Structures are given as structure tokens and as C-alpha cells.
């Protein structure tokens, strides 16, 4: 399994990458209050609330992997998936945050955050924050 960056979702672009197990989009996060009702994931869908700051890319990739039955997860991730199978999304998120394996893998790829002055940190207006969101087929849809 590997990740490809796409600039288009047309048939030609999708055909170049081979089988697609899921899509991960990068959105600008606006921080607006969302009054929509929370949707409960269907049975068999791995969905975890993000409990770790700055781990949305790791969580998006994990969501694709955990929801694709044709991908061999390996012994540790298969055990993790079975262990968290019946957990609600918030508890799955806590399980991710408490997993030594996932922490090690995330930290091996994560970039160090540059040091930010307190004045810059206080002025949030100029900061743009982005968030990764994954989409996966469920039951062939």
C-alpha cells in the first residue's frame, strides 16, 4: 500500500495510481461551531475521534487502512483493530493516543513544529490551520 498525491479525480488520474482504498483530503479548518447532529458510524466501520493534536494525517491514513478489508494490517494492527472494534469513537481515539506502536510510527514521520513566539501564538488571525479527512468505501459504496 502506498500514498499518492493527486491533483485531479478524473478517470485518467485515478487509473494511473492503481487500486484506490480511500481518499484523504486536506481542508482549511475554520473553527466554526458545527450544530449538525453527530453521525454514529455503521457496524464494521472504524471511526475514531481525534484526541491527539497535530495527528490528523496519521489518523486519516489509519482510517483508510482500518476500513479496507483487503489490506493486510500485520499482527499488531490486526490485534489493535480487534481490541477497539466495539469501542465508541472517543474511546477508539484514546486507544490510538495510548498506543506505543502508533506513537512511534507517527513520530518517525512527523515534522518538528518550529518554535513560535508568544506574540505570534497570540495572534491567531494570520495562522491558517489545515485538517486531513479520509473517505473510504463502505459495503462497496
List each model region and its residues.
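Cysteine-dependent deubiquitinase/ubiquitin-like isopeptidase catalytic cores across multiple families
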Residues: 1-141
